[in-house]
């Protein structure tokens, strides 16, 4: 059995790490490199960096900090933000990133997933899915351009359909960003995760809602996700990664202990 992964998420805007609630009202958390170094030292299995306004601004992720992060950490990291071409991806990988993640550009051009997977291998192609639960219809819908709340739009895709589509096209991993839960720290959407797990046959990463150590345990135990991504509980030092891993190990979760 592969070890489950704990993955801090760093949303980047204007060269700094920020955090919002339900993808809105972002506050500045701090500088990118010191935070990345801290999480690596605490025992994170990998890091994810989202340049949250790159796609909505029509630009690619700011590459200047990618190489600086690669110099100070020795764990894998993934970078996302406006990657729309093979050249964009090649540059980010050449600066030291281990994986690239695409979200809004994949919705605009689903063939991008296949082209990236064919060029770089499925192992480094992650597809992020921003999913919103509509209480009126009882359905989960995929959103696009979520880094800018004035441009966020609901797409034609229902989440379960898009999960299956991106796998057919070559996604090697899926990060499910559950927007309703984002930043509110009341737990992952286990019902949605279970539904996605049934149709997801590549590594699945849960994102949105972690507030306690028990929330991580529930995601691993009840929804069988491969990794759990979180931001505010780590940024605000509500949960220490080393202590979280020790707790999960006592609960029988296969986890890498530093």
UniProtKB/Swiss-Prot annotation:
Main location: cytoplasm
Gene: hisF
Quaternary state and interactors: Heterodimer of HisH and HisF.
Full protein name: Imidazole glycerol phosphate synthase subunit HisF
Catalyzed reactions per annotation: 5-[(5-phospho-1-deoxy-D-ribulos-1-ylimino)methylamino]-1-(5-phospho-beta-D-ribosyl)imidazole-4-carboxamide + L-glutamine = D-erythro-1-(imidazol-4-yl)glycerol 3-phosphate + 5-amino-1-(5-phospho-beta-D-ribosyl)imidazole-4-carboxamide + L-glutamate + H(+)
Family: Belongs to the HisA/HisF family.
Alphabetically ordered keywords of this record: Amino-acid biosynthesis, Cytoplasm, Histidine biosynthesis, Lyase
Coiled-coil stretches: none
Record's keyword annotation contains Amino-acid biosynthesis: yes
GO cellular component labels: cytoplasm
């Amino acid at each position: 059995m592969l070890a489950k992964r704990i993955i801090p998420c760093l949303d980047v805007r204007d060269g700094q790490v920020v955090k919002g609630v339900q993808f809105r009202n972002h506050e500045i958390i701090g500088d990118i490199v010191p935070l990345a170094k801290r999480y690596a030292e605490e025992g994170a299995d990998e890091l994810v960096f989202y340049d949250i306004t790159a796609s909505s601004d029509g630009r690619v992720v700011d590459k200047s900090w990618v190489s600086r992060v690669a110099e100070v950490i020795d764990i894998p990291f993934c970078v996302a933000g406006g990657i729309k071409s093979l050249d964009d991806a090649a540059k980010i990988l050449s600066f030291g990133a281990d994986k690239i993640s695409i979200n809004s550009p994949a919705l605009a051009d689903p063939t991008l997933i296949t082209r990236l997977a064919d060029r770089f291998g499925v192992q480094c192609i992650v597809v992020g899915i921003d999913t919103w639960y509509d209480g009126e219809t009882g359905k989960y819908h995929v959103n696009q351009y979520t880094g800018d709340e004035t441009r966020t739009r609901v797409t034609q895709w229902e989440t379960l359909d898009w999960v299956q589509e991106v796998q057919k096209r070559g996604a090697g991993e899926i990060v499910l960003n559950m927007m309703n839960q984002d930043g509110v720290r009341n737990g992952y959407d286990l019902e949605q995760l279970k539904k996605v797990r049934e149709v997801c046959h590549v590594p699945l990463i849960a994102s949105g809602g972690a507030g306690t150590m028990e929330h991580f345990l529930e995601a691993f135990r009840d929804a069988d996700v491969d990794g759990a991504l979180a931001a505010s509980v780590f940024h605000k030092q509500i949960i220490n990664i080393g202590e979280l891993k020790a707790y999960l190990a006592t609960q029988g979760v296969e986890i890498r202990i530093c």
